[in-house]
């Protein structure tokens, strides 16, 4: 289990649990699931959906596809962003998405 000290003041423990193909509405993509704890007693899932169309749009501009490792890294950066921005994440079960609105910014954080 890994730890992340968030800007909200909470220290989260988390680990990668599962990756699977998924759909959100009319969009297809990949869902990354992390198991997270705030108190080291209760563990809850946090899901990050990486939109396939956003990845394709990026690929068209960059001339190459995102690797599986890069996509995983983007999902993890979105998880950290949620930790930093959302207080009480355990109760809110946010809909975390990587799409055209945030993919480039997340990749920039990774120097990609």
Question: Where do the language-model regions lie?
Answer:
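Amphipathic alpha-helical interaction modules
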Residues: 33-63
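Short, charged/polar N-terminal "headpieces" of proteins
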Residues: 1-41
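Acidic, low-complexity intrinsically disordered segments
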Residues: 54-112
């Amino acid at each position: 289990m890994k730890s992340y000290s968030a800007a909200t003041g909470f220290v989260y423990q988390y680990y990668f649990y599962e990756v699977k193909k998924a759909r959100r509405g009319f969009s297809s993509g990949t869902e990354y699931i992390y198991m997270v704890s705030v108190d080291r007693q209760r563990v809850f899932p946090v899901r990050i959906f990486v939109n396939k169309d956003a990845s394709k749009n990026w690929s068209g501009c960059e001339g190459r596809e995102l690797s599986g490792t890069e996509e995983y890294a983007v999902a993890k950066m979105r998880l950290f962003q949620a930790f930093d921005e959302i207080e009480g994440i355990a109760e809110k079960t946010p809909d975390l998405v990587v799409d055209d609105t945030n993919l480039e910014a997340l990749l920039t954080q990774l120097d990609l």
